[in-house]
Amino acid sequence: MRRKATDVMLELIASAQAVGLSAKYVLFDSWFSSPKTLISLKEKCHMDTIALIKKNKTKYLYEGQNLNIKQIYSKNRKRRGRSKYLLSVNVTLKKDDEALPARIVCVRNKSNRKDWLALISTDTNLSEEELIRVYGKRWDIEVFFKSCKSYLKLVKECRSISYDALNAHVAIVFTRYMLLSVAKRRNEDDKTICDLLY
């Protein structure tokens, strides 16, 4: 029987918590950022979320109206100049009879300056700058795994079905990545030139 990815995700987080792993936030891309998922995560795992949201027809309760993100964006004045974000609004997520307050922050898309991206957080006390900074960590993790898969043979080099062999392979690939990161930093970071600025 196939299970929904969102149900499996909730199970994985609950099992991680059961063995003592903790985190401040769960970071998602837009795939998992539906109001239903965010509310379920808060209810079942008692964790706040920071996620990218899709510009689709998903409705958020904003100033007494059910609006999608494009409608919320067009209804509000944007911050001008070199601000880190364009818009920040508080909304309410709805699922059946349940409601959860959240904050949506819209930022410029770095790859297309005329476009914008929307981030959501269920921690309404989190500042806009901190929300953007924390979500940026998720992108660093994506780049890390893409590099490991594409260049360091994380997926293709080891064909074993032994747990120990797979674990050793992952450790070797991650060590390769760390060595390359240190070499890159030493070659590119001005602070490391001739050991002058340590």
Locations of regions flagged by a protein language model:
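Single, function-defining residue in the core of a domain
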Residues: 1-198
